[in-house]
Amino acid sequence: MILIIYAHPYPHYSHANKRMLEQARTLEGVEIRSLYQLYPDFNIDIAAEQEALSRADLIVWQHPMQWYSIPPLLKLWIDKVFSHGWAYGHGGTALHGKHLLWAVTTGGGESHFEIGAHPGFDVLSQPLQATAIYCGLNWLPPFAMHCTFICDDETLEGQARHYKQRLLEWQEAHHG
């Protein structure tokens, strides 16, 4: 099962993430958990989230890039749900062998994330990748949709279909 952990503080304003979710919903075996809808007060149901994760083979963290990082509720979710003794540490093997895909949208162009004037995309992903590895997850190459503020509808739809294709390819490779 593919579990999409969707974290967008302003989902009604996101054309890119909305299209990505619409495409993902057309696949079988996909569950979407919208953190800002489930936990507007940031009071996370840790047991429910761990139960959802236990059913997943692929975990997707989908969100907009915010100040070169993840939204605050996703950070809190990781801190609370990936707990010692469950996700890491003594006896913490619940996530071992599962896969993690970072699916992120950005307002800036791809060149904005090259090494030089701005941090490279590989640099920005390091904390998430390190978290994945520390918890025994298999880190997958990220999916990034850039220039979402200025993309036309056709481009957004094409990128959303590419996202769906990434998920489908993973399903076919791991579940035939």
From Swiss-Prot:
It is found in: Cell inner membrane. Keywords: Cell inner membrane, Cell membrane, Flavoprotein, FMN, Membrane, NAD, Oxidoreductase. Pfam families: Flavodoxin_2. It catalyses: a quinone + NADH + H(+) = a quinol + NAD(+); a quinone + NADPH + H(+) = a quinol + NADP(+). It is a peripheral membrane protein. The keyword Phosphoprotein does not apply. One of its GO terms (molecular function) is NADH:ubiquinone reductase (non-electrogenic) activity. FMN binds at H8, S14, H15, A16, N17, M65, Q66, W67, Y68, T105, T106, G107, G108. Its cofactor is FMN. InterPro entries: Flavodoxin_fold, Flavoprotein-like_sf, K_H_efflux_KefF, KefG/KefF. One of its GO terms (cellular component) is plasma membrane. Belongs to the NAD(P)H dehydrogenase (quinone) family. KefF subfamily. Homodimer. Interacts with KefC. PANTHER family: GLUTATHIONE-REGULATED POTASSIUM-EFFLUX SYSTEM ANCILLARY PROTEIN KEFF, GLUTATHIONE-REGULATED POTASSIUM-EFFLUX SYSTEM ANCILLARY PROTEIN KEFG. Regulatory subunit of a potassium efflux system that confers protection against electrophiles. Required for full activity of KefC. Shows redox enzymatic activity, but this enzymatic activity is not required for activation of KefC. This is Glutathione-regulated potassium-efflux system ancillary protein KefF. It comes from Escherichia coli O1:K1 / APEC.
